[in-house]
Amino acid sequence: MAVKVLVVDDSGFFRRRVSEILSADPTIQVVGTATNGKEAIDQALALKPDVITMDYEMPMMDGITAVRHIMQRCPTPVLMFSSLTHEGARVTLDALDAGAVDYLPKNFEDISRNPDKVKQMLCEKVHTISRSNRRLGSYARPAPVAAPVPASSPAPASSFASPAPARPAATARAAAPAASHSPAPKRKPYKLVAIGTSTGGPVALQRVLTQLPANFPAPIVLIQHMPAAFTKAFAERLDKLCRINVKEAEDGDMLRPGLALLAPGGKQMMIDGRGTVKILPGDERLNYKPCVDITFGSAAKSYGDKVLSVVLTGMGADGREGARLLKQGGSTVWAQDEASCVIYGMPMAIVKANLADAVYSLDDIGKHLVEACV
């Protein structure tokens, strides 16, 4: 069956061009259009589309408000269009927090002059998020930030709710989280925590990192597939929400406990044996900039068996080969479970390759990091 799409935008030109591009794909059907957020809610309730494309700035009701209402009344995967500016990044992150699944740059020049490029990106995104867990209501909003833990005192695992046990990788798809009785992670003197993610990652990272105490003992590196204009705004957002410090990584930054470094968009991040971050130009031969495999691979080379790596929600298989190198060196690999993923792609690649030491629900990953490292 064709993927049913509702196109929402106050620009007649953009609404028409998006509809034309999507309709040219025989596996996609545009079932309706709307010019503002209020119309979008009404059309979503009436047409029950599989995917909604949504603009932000619209009369009567903006896109973020519309997304919040839609998620409450008829949860539907939403693809936001956003500008590639710092303000556009902030708005897009707000939309993802409200429940949108993914985003695309809103570029009138591209949609006019590069229709083939836009068609490929847009149709691929629509197909991917149509298979997301958003409609099932299995991916809730971020957990509230816990009360601060004094940095001067250790944070025992008991200061958090008792974490759910791990699920064996072989049964990750079949077993429900509550049905698992596998052991919780063992403590180990990890020198680095490395987390990679893509679609659904901004909300997932927020959920994980807000559970960590200010005195978390291991340095953290974050690899999120995201454009260059977005990563600085995302790091600033996380820094305000978390008890640990978060910043966009710069060349020469030093890893240290209580600090998470986010790989800058459009570039690659590597780590050397002295704990120094190297930021390299994005290689055009690689699909992802930043690339999880690149950072994981450098961590494997520099830290041997002292890395705790986590692969969260995301499309594709980035992170699998880097995780393979980490496993070969004796390090630990965790994957997010299918039920709590927006897109079960990257974690599935880890599980199918038999690289996962444990599979955890998103709600439990932060707690388990505390248990394993603190």
From Swiss-Prot:
Recorded GO CC terms: cytoplasm
Compositionally biased residues, Low complexity: 154-183
Keywords: Chemotaxis, Cytoplasm, Hydrolase, Phosphoprotein
Xref: Pfam families: CheB_methylest, Response_reg
EC number(s) per entry: 3.1.1.61, 3.5.1.44
4-aspartylphosphate carried by residues: 55
Gene Ontology MF term list: phosphorelay response regulator activity; protein-glutamate methylesterase activity; protein-glutamine glutaminase activity
Chain positions covered by the region annotation Disordered: 144-186
GO biological process: chemotaxis
Residues the record marks as active site: 198, 225, 318
Reaction(s) catalysed by this chain's protein: [protein]-L-glutamate 5-O-methyl ester + H2O = L-glutamyl-[protein] + methanol + H(+); L-glutaminyl-[protein] + H2O = L-glutamyl-[protein] + NH4(+)
CDD domains in UniProt: CheB_Rec, REC_CheB-like
Subcellular location: Cytoplasm
Chief site of localization: cytoplasm
Location of the Response regulatory domain: 4-121
PTM remark: Phosphorylated by CheA. Phosphorylation of the N-terminal regulatory domain activates the methylesterase activity.
Keyword Transmembrane attached: no
CheB-type methylesterase domain mapped to chain residues: 183-374
Name of the top EC class for this enzyme: hydrolase
Domain comment in the entry: Contains a C-terminal catalytic domain, and an N-terminal region which modulates catalytic activity.
Family according to the record: Belongs to the CheB family.
Its biological purpose: Involved in chemotaxis. Part of a chemotaxis signal transduction system that modulates chemotaxis in response to various stimuli. Catalyzes the demethylation of specific methylglutamate residues introduced into the chemoreceptors (methyl-accepting chemotaxis proteins or MCP) by CheR. Also mediates the irreversible deamidation of specific glutamine residues to glutamic acid.
Protein name: Protein-glutamate methylesterase/protein-glutamine glutaminase
Organism: Pseudomonas putida (Arthrobacter siderocapsulatus)
